[in-house]
From Swiss-Prot:
Acts as a negative regulator of SRC by activating CSK which inhibits SRC activity and downstream signaling, leading to impaired cell spreading and migration. Regulates dendritic spine morphology. Involved in calcium-dependent exocytosis. May play a role in neurotransmitter release or synapse maintenance. The modification Phosphotyrosine is found at Y241, Y396. Tyrosine-phosphorylated in response to EGF and to cell adhesion to integrin ligands. Belongs to the SRCIN1 family. The lineage of its organism: Eukaryota, Metazoa, Chordata, Craniata, Vertebrata. It comes from Homo sapiens. GO terms for cellular component: actin cytoskeleton; axon; cytoplasm; dendrite; glutamatergic synapse; postsynaptic density; presynapse; synapse. It is found in: Cytoplasm; Cytoplasm, Cytoskeleton; Cell projection, Axon; Cell projection, Dendrite. It comes from the Eukaryota. Residues 654-674, 726-746 form a coiled coil. Expressed in some primary breast carcinomas where its presence is significantly associated with increased tumor size. Not detected in normal breast tissue. This is SRC kinase signaling inhibitor 1. Residues 31-41 have a biased composition (Gly residues).
Length: 1183
């Protein structure tokens, strides 16, 4: 039932599969010679719906692959050459054959390329699997990456643009060697490499991808059934676990599809040919050792004929004759070089016809050592079946595999698989490592003919433990499988438990990677005699005897052959290969492992002799050391340690299981913690959201429950109804008017008589409209009152915004007035100077004026952009003119009337300057000194203040000074002097004392002043009233001109009256524009809402330039300059006497009066601009 004949035409067919071909089941191609019944058949699976080509690699891809695996190739070449040289030196008679084999291996650009497949039909039964094994022996460490996809009909080529994996989309990354998304899908013995360029977003996508990659075997329904598990490999811990979250899938993830089905479910028998070993290493793991294939030489098709390949003597180990890459195992030893499929064991196949068949399964010698570090859960069967190596003489058992992982190597024997004894010993538990995860698919493809036919001797085909643990995570778990009855306990079976549980053959079946893996443990302690060895049909002594069968050979005692010659040849080959293995291991892997298995193997060699029959005695004694623990002592005591071996192995196995369980527990706890954290975070989020929602809902409800809001809503609804009614009435009235006009035109032009009913109808409509309109008008007052109630809040707000700054200003001015009065009284008390009665008379107008100014909200307003006037501009030049005449008007200062008030201001300034000097040194004094200084300074200030009022004696009259006089700072508060836009410090500051002294002297009301613009706008007004455009460079000149004007013309304008007469300037400073506009809007709103209510008088904005001009113009016509000059001279004389008593005041005063710099403010003088009433008023408080 071989399929090789069907492959020959397929091989000669065009290389690409058509879409129609894809609908047929995959072809299962054999590497080991297509002819001869396909006896070397290796299963190849073509991917359905995928076009595959014989040569998919482009030259660039091949070169890139070689470049990527350059390092591994170099190492592999070195090891292979060393091994071949060793073989040639050991077997000089076969040097030519070895050299040819070596050359063939070198010729292959990539040792994975299955070029020989194209010539399989010409090789017949002769080429031998040795050649192919040699070609396939290079298991690159990047095997899944760098294998030549030229020959593989599996559709895994990166360059295969015809591959149509469902979730894929082609991108530029496809051309890169290491595509960003590579998935390895394992099902049974097949591995598919898939390039994923998009994230697998759901399990359905993954199911579709898997079903597409395995179309003949898996469907979406099967994948979603509970009998199917999808496992993903944890590379860090080298275990497979069930895939629950597709986000775990990453680049280079290995996904295994596990079908919990009967043994044959997935693989019909027609796919198997003569039970040959079809498990070539098609996909070795990426980490696999480059040399693991060197010795994987398994029987070629000549095994079917029972004769060695023609070119090689039968004495040569079959590993040299026939290389079966089929049995190699793919180990996923996360990151480590996995061991080889099995030791280089070459057993003579036993056939009924007696013709010896060199059946050997020879893994890389280095694999024996490599396997020791493979972790429990390396599931390899999905990629390639391990060899079933029956535990023969025990010389070649894999000690590390036995101890560390329960891997079975399968070597299918020719013959009926089910003719094996009824004991049910499917596989002797030989090299436990060789079948790491040997799936049912693997077993069936290899052993259908030799394992699964009905056994003549009876006995359970599957042991009691079949399916006992469906998804075992590691082969170690196989030891727990219950054994079928019918045999003595296996005293040293690698995984056998206590003898009471033992059985002649314990079978453990792993359901894994798509179907069940069969693990049969063969108790090495099974008693077999030489006689039973010679009996062909003895069930206990033969594993798979039967007519025309080959015995299963592998690690462990050789199966008793029916032919003594076959047995002897097997033993001889076993010994030779054992010694070879030891030498090669020591040569290639010297120091790589703590102990070399060569000791064990040679020790086991001593346990059996070439002439020893394949009896149970030799078998039990030989099998013990090989399955013993790794230490060499195990091999040195071949017969004495079956129990110790079993216990030690069980301990190691149990320890591994405990570690795995503890790891799983830790992961489970982590998952629980994560879940709890997620729950907490979700709870917190829900609480936050709930609180936020409840707050918003309560806020909305509160807004609706707010009586004002409810009333506003009701009033708005009523207003809308009113407007609708009004609109309706208007419309009806329009219609009525039109109809009446039409009737009138008809009557006037056409002299048509209008019928009475029509007129009555119009009259009725008009009457109804009148009534409705009357009702509407009657309804309006109620609506108006309601709206006023609702809008009262807005009206109050507007009023508040309008009046509050003025109210604050008024309160502030009253405070200033009280302060001035108190200071004056105190000074009078201190100095004993009492004001004359006429001065007292001037106080009452002050208070009256202050109140009237406050009530009328009239202030001297200075916008922020223009700095306040400086005392030096008003007073300084006058002083300088009187003392040190300057410029072209040396006598103008004598004409000014306010000499005494100027001198009083000078004394105030002297006191202030003295205070600033002391304040600058405040930090140097203690608290006592500070208090003393404060008292002195306050006394000096209070002494200077009454002099200001002396002007009132000489100039009685209305004095609206409190409006404009900033409060004195008794504690010496100061602020930075204001700076002009041109950069000059406030050279035009208007200090309070100067204003106070000048105002009383402004008797006649001035004419309406011209509007002027602040100098910051580049506009100013000259003495004659002309508007001059100036730049910043001219600002100094303008200020000088203004100061000269003020020298000549001392302002006599009554500010209150002047301000009230001045219309609002058309061009207000920029900062004032918005405020004035807002005030206009507020005035309009209030005027509309308050029917008949008086609106607040608008603000008047007067720029400092305008006030200066007004003062100058008003002063021009002053008639009593001479009187003022006399008063000033008298006051100056008195003041000089007062200052003589105070040296500090005298010094500062002389500096102020005589220094020509007195026109500019001192650096320490400061003025605080007071911004009130929306920034409209800007008075300056100077110290």
């Amino acid at each position: 039932m071989g399929n090789a004949p069907s492959q020959d035409p397929e091989r000669s067919s065009p290389p690409m599969l058509s879409a129609d071909d894809a609908e047929y089941p995959r072809e299962y191609r054999t590497l080991g010679g297509g002819g001869g019944g396909g006896s070397g058949g290796r299963r190849f699976s073509n991917v359905g719906l995928v076009h595959t080509s014989e040569r998919r690699h482009t030259v660039i891809a091949a070169q890139s692959l070689e470049a990527l695996s350059g390092l591994q190739k170099a190492d592999a070449d070195r090891k292979r050459d060393a091994f071949m040289d060793h073989l040639k030196s050991k077997y000089p008679q076969h040097a030519l054959a070895l050299r040819g084999q070596q050359d063939r291996m070198r010729e292959q650009p990539n040792y994975w390329s299955f070029k020989t497949r194209s010539s399989r039909h010409t090789q017949g039964a002769q080429p031998g699997l040795a050649d192919q094994a040699a070609k396939l022996s290079y298991a690159s460490a990047e095997s899944l990456e760098t294998m030549s996809e030229a020959e593989l009909p599996l559709g895994f080529s990166r360059m295969n643009r015809f591959r149509q994996s469902l979730p894929l989309s082609r991108s530029a990354s496809q051309t890169k060697l290491r595509s960003p998304g590579v998935l390895f899908l394992q099902f049974g013995e097949e591995t598919r490499r898939v390039h994923i360029t998009h994230e697998v977003s759901s399990l359905d996508t993954l199911h579709a991808l898997i079903a597409h990659m395995f179309p003949q075997k898996l469907t979406m329904g099967m994948l979603k059934s509970p009998n199917t598990a999808i496992l993903i490999k944890d590379e860090a811990r080298n275990v497979f676990y069930e895939l629950e979250d597709v986000r775990d899938i990453q680049d280079r993830s290995i996904i295994k599809i596990y079908r919990k089905e009967p043994l044959y479910a997935a693989f019909p028998g027609s796919h198997l040919t003569n039970g040959d070993l079809r498990r070539e290493m098609v996909y070795a793991s990426r980490e696999s050792s480059p040399t693991r294939r060197l010795n994987n030489l398994s029987p070629a098709p000549h095994l079917a004929s029972g004769s060695p390949p023609p070119g090689l003597p039968s004495g040569l180990p079959s590993g040299l004759q026939s290389g079966s890459p089929s049995r190699s195992r793919l180990s996923y030893a996360g990151g480590r070089p996995p061991s080889y499929a099995g030791s280089p064991v070459h057993h003579a196949a036993e056939r009924l016809g007696g013709a010896p068949a060199a059946q050997g399964v020879s893994p890389s010698p280095s694999a024996i050592l490599e396997r020791r570090d493979v972790k429990p859960d390396e599931d390899l069967a999905s990629k390639a079946g391990g060899m079933v190596l029956v535990k023969g003489e025990g010389l070649y058992a894999d000690p590390y595999g036995l101890l560390h992982e329960g891997r079975l190597s399968l070597a299918a024997a020719a013959g009926d698989p089910f003719a094996y004894p009824g004991a049910g010993g499917l596989y002797k538990r030989g090299s436990v490592r060789s079948l790491s995860t040997y799936s049912a698919a693997a077993l069936q493809s290899d052993l259908e003919d030799s394992l699964y036919k009905a056994a003549g001797g009876g006995g359970p085909l599957y042991g009691d433990g079949y399916g006992f643990r469906l998804p075992p995570s590691s082969p170690q778990k196989l030891a727990d499988v219950a054994a079928p009855p019918g045999g003595p306990p296996p005293p040293h079976s690698p995984y056998s438990g206590p003898p009471s549980r033992g059985s002649p053959v314990r079978q453990s079946f792993r359901k894994d990677s798509g179907s069940s893996s069969v693990f049969a443990e063969s108790p090495g302690g099974k008693t077999r005699s030489a006689g039973s060895a010679s009996t062909a049909g003895a069930p206990p002594s033969e594993l798979f005897p039967g007519p025309g069968e080959r015995s299963l050979v592998g690690f462990g005692p050789p199966v008793p052959a029916k032919d003594t010659e076959t047995r002897e040849r097997m033993e001889a080959m076993e010994k030779q290969i054992a010694s070879l293995t030891g030498l090669v291991q020591s040569a290639l892997l010297r120091g790589s492992e703590p102990e070399t298995p060569s000791e064990k193997i040679e020790g086991s060699n001593g346990a059996a002799t070439p002439s020893a029959p394949c009896g149970s005695g030799g078998r039990s004694s030989g099998a013990t050391p090989v399955s013993g623990p790794p230490p060499p002592s195990a091999s040195s005591t071949p017969a004495g340690q079956p129990t110790a071996v079993s216990r030690l192995q069980m301990q190691l196995h149990l320890r591994g299981l405990q570690n795995s369980a503890s790891d799983l527990r830790g992961q489970l706890q982590q998952l629980r913690k994560l879940q709890l954290q997620n729950q907490e975070s979700v709870r917190a989020l829900l609480k936050r959201t709930e609180a936020e929602l409840s707050m918003r809902v309560s806020e909305a409800a509160r807004r609706q429950e707010d009586p004002l809001q409810r009333q506003r809503t009701l009033v708005e609804e009523e207003r809308l109804r009113y407007l609708n009614d009004e609109e309706l009435i208007t419309q009806q009235l329009n219609d009525l008017e039109k109809s009446v006009e039409k009737i009138q035109r008809d009557v006037s032009h056409n002299h048509r008589l209008v019928p009475g009913p029509e007129l009555e109808e119009k009259a009725l409509v008009l009457k109804q409209l009148g009534e409705t309109l009357t009702e509407l008008k009657a309804h309006f007052p109620g609506l108006q009152s309601k709206m006023r109630v609702v809008l009262r809040v807005e009206v109050e707000a507007v009023k508040f915004l309008k009046e509050e700054p003025q109210r604050l200003d008024g309160l502030l001015k009253r405070c200033r007035g009280v302060t001035d009065t108190l200071a004056q009284i105190r000074r009078q008390v201190d100095e004993g100077v009492w004001p004359p009665p006429n001065n007292l008379l001037s106080q009452s107008p002050k208070k009256v004026t202050a109140e009237t100014d406050f009530n009328k909200s009239v202030d001297f307003e200075m916008p922020p952009p223009s700095p306040p006037l400086n005392l030096h501009e008003l007073s300084g030049p006058a002083e300088g003119a009187s003392l040190t005449p300057k410029g072209g008007n040396p006598t103008k200062g004598l004409d000014t009337p306010g000499k005494r008030s100027v001198d009083k201001a000078v004394s105030v300034e002297a006191a202030e300057r003295d205070w600033e000097e002391k304040r600058a040194a405040l930090t140097q004094y203690s608290a006592k000194d500070i208090n003393r200084l404060l008292e002195e300074t306050q006394a000096e200030l209070l002494k200077a203040i009454p002099d200001l009022d002396c002007a009132s004696k000489a100039h009685p009259g209305p004095a609206p000074t409190p409006d404009h006089k900033p409060p004195k700072a008794p504690h010496g508060q100061k602020a930075a002097p204001r700076t002009e836009p041109s950069g000059r410090r406030g050279s035009d500051e208007l200090t309070v004392p100067r204003y106070r002294t000048e105002k009383p002297s402004k008797s006649p009301p001035p004419p309406p002043p011209r509007r002027s613009f602040p100098s910051s706008h580049g506009l100013t007004t000259t003495r004659t009233g002309e508007v001059v455009v100036t730049s910043k460079k001219d600002s100094a000149f303008i200020k000088k001109a203004e100061s000269e004007e003020l020298e000549v013309q001392k302002p006599q304008v009554k500010l209150r009256r002047a301000v009230s007469e001045v219309a609002r300037p058309a061009s207000t400073p920029p900062i004032m524009a918005s405020a004035i506009k807002d005030e206009d809007d507020e005035d309009r709103i209030i005027a509309e809402l308050e029917s008949g209510g008086g609106s607040v008088p608008p603000m008047k904005v007067v720029t400092p330039g305008a006030s200066r001009l007004k003062a100058a113009q008003g002063q021009a016509g002053s008639p009593d300059k001479s009187k003022h000059g006399k008063q000033r001279a008298e006051y100056m004389r008195i003041q000089a006497q007062q200052q003589a008593t105070k040296p500090s005041k005298e010094m500062s005063g002389s500096n102020e009066t005589s220094s020509p710099v007195s026109e500019k403010p001192s650096a320490s003088r400061t003025s605080i601009p007071v911004l009130t009433s929306f920034g409209a008023r800007n008075s300056s408080i100077s110290f």
